[in-house]
């Protein structure tokens, strides 16, 4: 799947949400969601869920929730399918406002593995990188690498 050089404004919910995909590239994408009120609920930017071999590069994301969220299923369903989100590269991105720049979870019952975040700028987010889960959710996070972030 290739999503490249598009601008998305005011998506009503999670903006780009590939699920159970292999070989996903999101490049040169601009997301303003919402464009005027940076506090809109559930206005995530890019949310790969149970995907493998994902590259997110050279994106500009300004949202009211999380800019990029890595997911892999929720509770019993996530454990039942057991498909991790893995081999994720996030590089050369600018993330503004929102709760988190890059967030792992909270829907991560299938696990998250081999994530690299590099050369990214977080400006005005509540947190740059955030790991979150809920009681009883389960799932592992393995091999998280972070390099040259501001």
Task: Annotate the PLM regions.
Residues 1-150:
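Extracellular/periplasmic carbohydrate-active domains that bind, remodel
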């Amino acid at each position: 799947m290739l999503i490249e050089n598009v601008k998305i404004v005011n998506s009503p919910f999670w903006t780009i949400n590939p699920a159970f995909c292999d070989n996903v590239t999101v490049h040169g994408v601009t997301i303003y969601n919402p464009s005027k009120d940076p506090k809109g609920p559930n206005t995530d930017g890019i949310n790969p869920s149970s995907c493998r071999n994902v590259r997110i590069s050279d994106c500009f994301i300004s949202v009211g929730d999380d800019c990029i969220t890595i997911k892999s299923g929720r509770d019993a369903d996530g454990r039942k399918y057991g498909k991790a989100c893995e081999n994720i590269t996030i590089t050369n991105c600018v993330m503004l406002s929102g709760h988190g720049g890059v967030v792992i979870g909270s829907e991560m019952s299938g696990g998250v593995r081999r994530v690299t975040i590099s050369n990214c700028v977080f400006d005005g987010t509540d947190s740059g990188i955030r790991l979150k889960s809920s009681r009883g959710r389960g799932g592992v996070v393995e091999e998280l690498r972070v390099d040259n972030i501001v």
